[in-house]
UniProtKB/Swiss-Prot annotation:
Pfam families associated with the record: UPF0444
This protein's UniProt keywords: Membrane, Transmembrane, Transmembrane helix
Region (Disordered): 1-36
Main location: membrane
S-S pairs: none
The protein's name: Transmembrane protein 263
Membrane topology: Multi-pass membrane protein
Family that this chain belongs to: Belongs to the TMEM263 family.
Gene that this polypeptide is encoded by: tmem263
Example of a GO cellular component annotation carried by this entry: membrane
Function comment: May play a role in bone development.
UniProt subcellular location: Membrane
Length: 120
């Protein structure tokens, strides 16, 4: 038994099974069910997150996927699970379909866009 304990003590800290005591010192965990304002700086997206835009400010509920970029939620509908239409920014998918980015493509026709027929 004492030989096994001695082997554990000889291992470097990064090989130990136990996490360090100050693991969350620099990155505190956001509270579940809270809303984070997405307007520059840190934001979070939760599994099955729902986003909304109110007065030009995007809001995304929850936690678990942290980024540090300015983000705007995509106002276009998403054509398939896990596909986001975001131009020149950051996109993230967490559980459901959530697209965020620094610039959203405006007026993007998706799928069944209105096509002119011969009578027009």
């Amino acid at each position: 038994m004492s030989e096994t304990n001695q082997q554990r003590d000889d291992l470097p800290a990064y090989l130990n099974d136990e996490p360090p005591a100050d693991a969350n010192k620099d990155h505190p965990q956001p509270q579940p069910g809270m809303f984070s304002r997405v307007a520059g700086g840190l934001f979070s997206v939760t599994k099955g997150a729902v986003g909304a835009t109110v007065g030009g400010v995007a809001w995304v509920g929850g936690k678990s996927f942290d980024l540090t970029k300015t983000a705007v939620t995509s106002v276009a509908s998403v054509p398939a699970m896990g596909v986001g239409l975001v131009k020149g920014g950051v996109s993230a998918v967490a559980g459901g379909v959530t697209a965020v980015g620094s610039a959203v493509v405006s007026k993007v026709p998706i799928g069944g866009g209105k096509k002119k027929d011969k009578s027009d």
